[in-house]
């Protein structure tokens, strides 16, 4: 049974994030977009320590002008200890900008995640990644490269159980992520970014999890582009495939 206390924590978390988003959006002179993300995230358990993730995503960005992205994130994960994951992969991103040149990005990444389960199944984690971005303008046949560092700190909180791994578990999560592009040449113009998310998920069983989050991000820009605020609405279907 859900306790009033745990639901209260969830509502307080979401309310705080919404209020912060409103505060960021009070300056009407800032460009503002709505983004809608849909993900199918299958993960294959190869062995006790190795797994392979192949997240596929479509992102609709309601900016001026409108554009969409198709993303594929094949990633290997090695877990030498229960509290640490090492990741590496090559991501692929196609951007259709309609009124501008289409883009294709190849993005090798490496990362390390450290995590700790604390009181009542609450899990804290820190996920640090380095990306090498290779972006090609498909109309002009130009290629730009940039390195980007990103760091995400997250808390996951089970609601109706004291573990995140039990069947029929509801849980909430919140995180903040910082992005720092070290070479501000890639065409998206994003020199720095902060992203805040809060969401809820239902772990049906060891195979299926359904996840929704609301987030907002604030982006600083190079190339003389203005600061922008973005609202994000995301739904993910997480599919754990046994060996």
Q: Each predicted region: which residue ranges?
A:
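Transmembrane beta-strands of outer-membrane beta-barrel proteins
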Residues: 52-54, 84-88, 122-128, 149, ...
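Outer-membrane beta-barrel "beta-signal"
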Residues: 112, 155-157, 229-243
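Start-of-domain marker
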Residues: 27-89
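Residues that define the transmembrane beta-barrel architecture of outer-membrane proteins
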Residues: 32-36, 68-70, 104-108, 143-151, ...
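N-terminal signal peptide c-region/cleavage motif recognized by signal peptidases
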Residues: 20-22
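Transmembrane beta-strands of outer-membrane beta-barrel pores
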Residues: 56-62, 90-96, 116, 130-134, ...
């Amino acid at each position: 049974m859900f306790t009033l206390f745990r639901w209260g924590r969830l509502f307080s978390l979401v309310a705080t994030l919404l209020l912060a988003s409103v505060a960021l959006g009070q300056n009407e002179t800032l460009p503002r977009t709505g983004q809608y993300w849909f993900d199918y995230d299958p993960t294959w358990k190869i062995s006790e320590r190795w797994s392979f993730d192949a997240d596929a995503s479509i992102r609709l960005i309601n900016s001026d002008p409108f554009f969409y992205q198709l993303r594929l994130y094949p990633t290997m994960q090695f877990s030498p200890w229960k509290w640490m994951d090492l990741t590496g992969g090559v991501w692929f991103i196609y951007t259709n900008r309609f009124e501008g040149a289409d883009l294709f990005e190849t993005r090798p990444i490496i990362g390390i995640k450290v995590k700790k389960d604390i009181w009542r199944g609450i899990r804290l984690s820190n996920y640090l990644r380095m990306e090498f971005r290779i972006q090609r303008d498909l109309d002009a046949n130009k290629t730009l490269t940039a390195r980007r560092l990103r760091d995400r700190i997250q808390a996951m909180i089970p609601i109706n159980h004291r573990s995140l791994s039990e069947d029929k578990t509801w849980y909430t999560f919140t995180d903040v992520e910082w992005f720092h592009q070290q070479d501000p040449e890639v065409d998206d113009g994003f020199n720095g970014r902060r992203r805040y998310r809060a969401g809820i998920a239902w772990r049906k069983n060891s195979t299926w999890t359904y996840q929704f989050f609301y987030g907002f991000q604030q982006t600083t820009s190079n190339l003389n582009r203005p600061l922008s605020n973005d609202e994000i609405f995301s739904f993910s279907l997480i599919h754990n495939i046994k060996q």
